[in-house]
């Protein structure tokens, strides 16, 4: 693994997607925030509209270095990490996190990792169930304005704190989100235990920090359904994925993939301090 600093891999100042559990286990608060990487084990999160984070609250921050990138190869060769941390200090518009655990991926390999002494991955004894099938009978009209946004960030309900991952996606004009993965992945297993999730589309393919601080993004929350291969919608969506992301044609055509439909309950606005 590399000896490079986290900021060398990700960048010193990036956009992040932060997720934390609310007062109830079934609630998740999700923010788009600025991130200053202070060290390999410390982040400063910046919230232009304020936040509701508290000292000692566990927060997961998705980090990657894809700002300004709109094309990828099949191995997704960008540095990316699901940074799990603890809030150590706050102001009205900022919060500092101390790292609990993270792994930085590049392609399919781990380039850098950290975990505090004594950390163990939390056991998850929630039962897995088959996802309900999507009610769609035909592919919806897709949102062409999101064509430059090749990948977004999926936040799922893991034990203790959320899990984040980047996903190639399609979005409809009705805020449906579609994504594809293998059923053996950690995110797929989490969805089989709780099919609620959040999906953030942050526009970082065309983002610069010099632009207006009110960043162009949306956060979709809802329930995930499976689109079975027997459904007439499956090949329609599959072809649309290949058109949007031809660099992943081999993956989208793999016989073992599972296709998911996030049916939006609402578009989540950024959490603000009241």
Model regions and ranges:
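Binding-site signature for planar aromatic cofactors or substrates
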Residues: 1-274
